[in-house]
Structures are given as structure tokens and as C-alpha cells.
UniProtKB/Swiss-Prot annotation:
InterPro entries according to UniProt: GTP-dep_dephospho-CoA_kin
Residues annotated to bind GTP: D33, V34, D52, K54, E103
Organism: Ignicoccus hospitalis (strain KIN4/I / DSM 18386 / JCM 14125)
Protein family: Belongs to the GTP-dependent DPCK family.
Record GO biological process: coenzyme A biosynthetic process
Known pathway: Cofactor biosynthesis; coenzyme A biosynthesis
Protein name: GTP-dependent dephospho-CoA kinase
Catalytic activity: 3'-dephospho-CoA + GTP = GDP + CoA + H(+)
């Protein structure tokens, strides 16, 4: 699982100065302190940012949210359902989320809560920033990843309006999905 999630799940942008051009007209969601701070420096204000006030587990800077901050607890290496619900609320209300614990995997509920056509950015250590264009297929891709997690996956799927008893893809979609994401 860690190996699967360690590789970029979108387009790796090595030169972040390109972000204003790549994100023109997009609603932006960011995950991570460094990614959020760099976006702000470039004049890109995320609708929602998910951060923990640290970088690489050491104390860092406090980010100033334009529309308020919700708080969530999320243990390292997990997606706590309560934290996922806070992220969903933040996406709906254009607020930011400060996480006690680890924010990395909260990119998944952020993506699932976002509208198609938006963009999600998260850092890829020592490589750049990963840009995920949010659409039906990226959502299905991350839902497939969620199915591999331990815990109450069905409750998580229901929270994000997916019926765990229904197939996620139709036959035509499945073939296209396999072309887009062959590693799963």
C-alpha cells in the first residue's frame, strides 16, 4: 500500500513556477504546509488547504486561512472517518483544515469531496508537486485505493455517496480506467 501511494497519482510538476499557468481558472485544493505556502507565494489561494503546521514532522510556520480553520485529528498512515468528514465540510464551506497528526492521506477525502474540474495539489518530497485534475476517473481511482485499506471501508464509501454494493464502473468505463491506471 505504501509503495502504491508513494508514487505520484497525478502529474508531477517539477517547476512550481508553472502552477499559475496550469491552474488558471481552476478551483484549488492543497494538501501539505509547503505546498500551500508555495501556492500562496505564487498568488494562488486554495479554496481549501489541509495542513498540520509542520514539515517533515518538525515545527514549521502557521498558515493564515482566509475563511477560517476547522480542526481534525488523523493518525499517521490512516484516514480517520471523523477527519474525512471535517475535510468534506471544509471543501463545502471554503475553509481550511489544521490536522493534529498527519494530513497526507486526507488528500483522498479532499479529492472525493471536490467538484469535477477542480485541481488538487500535494507535495512529492524531493521531486516537486503533484497536480491531480479532479474528474470521474481520478475519483474512481482513489475509491479503488480506499477499498484496499483496513477498517470500515463501507461506511467511508457511504459518507462520500458511493454504494459499496454497486460496481464503481460500467464495462466501457472499466476499459478506459484500465488504460488510465494500469497499475491497480
Amino acid at each position: 500500500m505504501r509503495t502504491l501511494l508513494a508514487s505520484p497519482r497525478g502529474a508531477l510538476v517539477k517547476d512550481d513556477r508553472l502552477l499559475p499557468f496550469l491552474l488558471r481558472g481552476k478551483t484549488l485544493v492543497t494538501v501539505g504546509d509547503v505546498t500551500t505556502k508555495r501556492c500562496l507565494e505564487l498568488g494562488l489561494v486554495p479554496r481549501t488547504a489541509i495542513f498540520d503546521g509542520k514539515t517533515r514532522r518538525s515545527q514549521w510556520v502557521e498558515l493564515r486561512a482566509p475563511n477560517g480553520v476547522l480542526k481534525a485529528f488523523n493518525p499517521p498512515g490512516q484516514i480517520c472517518l471523523d477527519a474525512a468528514k471535517v475535510v468534506k465540510k471544509a471543501i463545502l464551506t471554503s475553509t481550511w483544515v489544521k490536522v493534529e497528526g498527519e494530513e497526507d492521506l486526507l488528500a483522498i477525502p479532499a479529492l472525493l469531496s471536490s467538484e469535477n474540474g477542480w485541481a488538487l495539489l500535494y507535495g512529492q518530497p524531493k521531486a516537486g508537486v503533484v497536480l491531480v485534475e479532479i474528474n470521474k476517473y481520478t475519483k474512481l481511482h482513489f475509491l479503488e485505493i480506499i477499498k484496499m485499506f483496513d477498517g470500515d471501508v463501507e461506511e467511508f464509501l457511504r459518507e462520500f455517496d458511493y454504494d459499496p454494493n454497486q460496481p464503481l464502473l460500467g464495462e466501457l468505463d472499466e476499459r478506459l480506467y484500465d488504460l488510465l491506471f494500469p497499475e491497480l
